[in-house]
Amino acid sequence: LDYKDFKRIKFDKQFPNPFNYSWMNIDSLFLMRPSDYPSVKNILKSIQSWDRVASADSYGAGSYAVLYSKLRKYYNKLPDPKIFTTSVLNKALIEALEHMEKYFGTTKIKLGSFQKLVRGDKELSIFGLPDIISSMGSAPYKEGMRKVVSGESYIELVKFTPKGVEIESIISYGSSDHPKSKHFNDQ
């Protein structure tokens, strides 16, 4: 494993195929035929054809993120082993579409339009979803969006070479917690 491969793995934004959640099963989502669910066929196609990369500019990731946020209310009602049925998934897909239409005026949004990194008055489109290596957890924000509240934060990569130590580091937002500091949101 070389340094380039290590960085590729560290910053991987892709879900496995099939999903491999340890706490829920949504495999039925990929068995649903869009033609059997005309009211949600477009969002269903978007998710099913998605490459499972949670990049900020991905429409499939945007559709999946909105659906994922709608599944939360159904999760606790499911008996163990927490298998989402097509009936529950259809309801959640309808809610996801309604959410997109209400807040974004469309049924097709990029992940970065739905999910933001927020610090002070700075708001950035952000990659990532829960349960990938470069995971991002989010909470309700404003105007139908979500903001990242956990996940990638301070990262330091250290490489020991014959010429000495090489360090790469980044911290989300900035190096100060003081809103008036120029380093509050400069990274």
Question: Where do the protein language model's features map onto the residues?
Answer:
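Acidic, low-complexity N-terminal propeptides/linkers enriched in Ser/Thr/Asp/Gly that mediate export
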Residues: 7-187
